[in-house]
């Protein structure tokens, strides 16, 4: 370690990998002035936009996506892995990395293998309730294994939550509520339902909630609905005096959206659950019906603390909204109980915790190397 600590973040590909990495980067910069931070990615991932926007250095390697079925890609995989590991080892040497923090995904796998070869200590963070292949490999030789939940399939883990950007973790919903509702055109005393399906929206959520628009309006419920830039949303013509149904392709100010809302209907990806619970917002989670049920598992902790409900995508309907969501939104006592349960499940300090662990690991490794000499 040459005076300042150098950290390599391996979390490229999707927002679910990049956003926790950037939250930890911000925490590292706040905790350790002068820390050198480098993100590892590929030209295909969202990191090519998100990392430079946050002001951090980005190094690109050959992508190593794991094929989901037998194909020519499977035969080329060993060659791609070797090339990506070689490239990553060169980057580790160039930046004089003291520690690698991996967040899973196809960027993390070569990072773990390269770090092991270069004898750079590894910290693994798993955001999902069911760990992927990369983190299963990395956990075998990591110094510390951190997780959002207690049993992601990585053996012994330290539960720290999922790192979330500070604009969310520092949000005071009650203090910002009046400003947030004015921003979207809602009354101060409105009951507001927030609907979103991630950065791309969710068609089934769109169809169901828009189909329940009349029932929501009849109950006096305002709606803030982010339907996704690639989707369209059809709504009935409002009747005179109906509360607003604000439909937008994308919400650039999720902090204001969370502050304005009393309840959310959303998917249960790891980052969504982390943000919604960090701000203490009650939610109806609709797991994406793909994979091995990871999204249902992601929502389990907040459901167990009483901060949310889970409904299968196939069971979500306009009738469900009318029969379950409307009564919930009009029950002040139940909303207050769910708010407390959501906050109990959330981890506002996850990014700082991961950053502290990584800095400790880097210092311990540096001390060990000095001792060997």
Curated annotation (Swiss-Prot):
It is an enzyme of class 2 (transferase). Pathway: Cell wall biogenesis; peptidoglycan biosynthesis. UDP-N-acetyl-alpha-D-glucosamine binds at residues 14-16, 128, 165, 199, 295. Its main location: membrane. It catalyses: di-trans,octa-cis-undecaprenyl diphospho-N-acetyl-alpha-D-muramoyl-L-alanyl-D-glutamyl-meso-2,6-diaminopimeloyl-D-alanyl-D-alanine + UDP-N-acetyl-alpha-D-glucosamine = di-trans,octa-cis-undecaprenyl diphospho-[N-acetyl-alpha-D-glucosaminyl-(1->4)]-N-acetyl-alpha-D-muramoyl-L-alanyl-D-glutamyl-meso-2,6-diaminopimeloyl-D-alanyl-D-alanine + UDP + H(+). Belongs to the glycosyltransferase 28 family. MurG subfamily. This is UDP-N-acetylglucosamine--N-acetylmuramyl-(pentapeptide) pyrophosphoryl-undecaprenol N-acetylglucosamine transferase. It comes from Mycobacterium sp. (strain KMS). The lineage of its organism: Bacteria, Bacillati, Actinomycetota, Actinomycetes, Mycobacteriales. The gene is murG.
């Amino acid at each position: 370690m040459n005076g300042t600590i150098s950290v390599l973040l391996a979390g490229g590909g999707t927002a679910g990998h990049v956003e926790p990495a950037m939250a930890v980067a911000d925490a590292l910069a706040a905790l350790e002035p002068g820390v050198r931070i480098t993100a590892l990615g590929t030209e295909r991932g969202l990191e090519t936009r998100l990392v430079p926007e946050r002001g951090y250095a980005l190094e690109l390697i050959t992508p190593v996506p794991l094929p989901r079925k037998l194909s020519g890609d499977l035969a080329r995989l060993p060659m791609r892995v070797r090339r990506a590991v070689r490239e990553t080892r060169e980057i580790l040497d160039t930046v004089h990395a003291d520690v690698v923090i991996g967040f899973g995904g196809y960027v993390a796998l070569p990072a773990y293998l390269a770090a092991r070869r270069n004898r750079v200590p590894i910290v693994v963070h798993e955001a999902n309730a069911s760990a992927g292949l990369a983190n299963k490999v990395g956990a075998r030789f990591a110094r510390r294994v951190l997780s959002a939940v207690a049993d992601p399939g990585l053996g012994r883990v330290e539960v720290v939550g999922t790192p979330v950007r500070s604009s969310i973790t520092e949000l005071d919903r009650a203090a910002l509520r009046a400003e947030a509702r004015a921003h979207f055109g809602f009354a101060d005393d409105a009951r507001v339902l927030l609907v979103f399906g991630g950065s791309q929206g969710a068609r089934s959520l769109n169809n169901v909630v828009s189909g329940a628009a009349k029932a929501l309006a009849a109950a006096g419920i305002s709606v803030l609905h982010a339907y996704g830039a690639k989707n369209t949303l059809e709504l009935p013509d409002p009747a005179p005096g109906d509360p607003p149904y604000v439909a937008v392709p994308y919400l650039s100010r999720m902090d204001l959206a969370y502050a304005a809302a009393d309840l959310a209907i959303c998917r249960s990806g790891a980052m969504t659950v982390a943000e919604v619970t960090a701000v203490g917002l009650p939610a109806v989670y609709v797991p994406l019906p793909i994979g091995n049920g990871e999204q249902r598992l992601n929502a389990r902790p907040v459901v167990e603390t009483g901060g949310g409900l889970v409904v299968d995508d196939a069971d979500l309907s306009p009738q469900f909204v009318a029969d379950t969501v409307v009564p919930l939104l009009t029950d002040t006592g139940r909303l207050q109980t769910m708010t407390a349960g959501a906050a109990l499940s959330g981890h506002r300090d996850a990014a700082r915790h991961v950053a502290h662990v990584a800095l400790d690991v880097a210092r311990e490794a540096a001390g060990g190397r000095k001792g060997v000499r």
